[in-house]
Amino acid sequence: CQFDGNTISGYKRMIATKDSFQSFNVTEPHISASALEWIDPDSSLRDHINVIVSRDLSFQDLSETPCQIDLSTASIDGAWGSGVGFNLVCTVSLTECSAFLTSIKACDAAMCYGSTTANLVRGQNTIHIVGKGGHSGSKFMCCHDTKCSTTGLVAAAPHLDRVTGYNQADSDKIFDDGAPECGMSCWFKKSGEWILGVLNGNWMVVAVLIALLILSILLFTLCCPRRPSYRKEHKP
């Protein structure tokens, strides 16, 4: 379950207006079939108290929040892929409100691979997100809802970080952010990221493979030349 909304309930919003009225100390109310009664222990009320019950409070905008969040990616440990896992360190800045309970996700350009619940306070917050997934071209970013950090970091290869990686099996880690499955556009983005990752991080391997392909074609043409007279020699 992922909570993304406001932490101030309608009751707290109503209580926030109590400074606009005069308050009195009374006992616990006694509710009868037709009356709501209580006693004034201080005897400061000379007349009576009028209680007005209405539905004029607007509860339509309770899901909206004035909180503003800015995200930046600090560091990453671990490896991409589904075996080792990674730990993404995010710096989250909260403004416009004093506290905010929400979720921060670790995503690349295609999809998200982990999420954690964060109780943010005003100012800078350091959040650690443990996730699994991605590929060599994944640049993991810190995201909140649809907003992500401007830069992403690339994790190490699984065979290089097998020992120091985050091979987590704890129940308090969230590896699913509740997003729908990866669709057609998502797979195109993943394929593009993977190709760019291969070209950027392993360009020497690609160059060697291309050179071996050209050398194999040349050796094949030299060692196994085409025989145009084969049909004439075996003509019945």
UniProtKB/Swiss-Prot annotation:
Residue ranges of the TM segments:
203-223
- Glycan-carrying positions: N25
What spans does the record annotate as topological domain Cytoplasmic, numbered to this chain? 224-236
Keyword field: Disulfide bond, Fusion of virus membrane with host endosomal membrane, Fusion of virus membrane with host membrane, Glycoprotein, Host endoplasmic reticulum, Host Golgi apparatus, Host membrane, Host-virus interaction, Membrane, Phosphoprotein, Repeat, Transmembrane, Transmembrane helix, Viral attachment to host cell, Viral penetration into host cytoplasm, Virion, Virus entry into host cell
Segments on the Lumenal side according to the record's topology features: 1-202
Disulphide bridges in this chain?
C67-C97, C90-C142, C107-C112, C143-C148, C182-C186
Q: Can you name this protein? A: Envelope glycoprotein
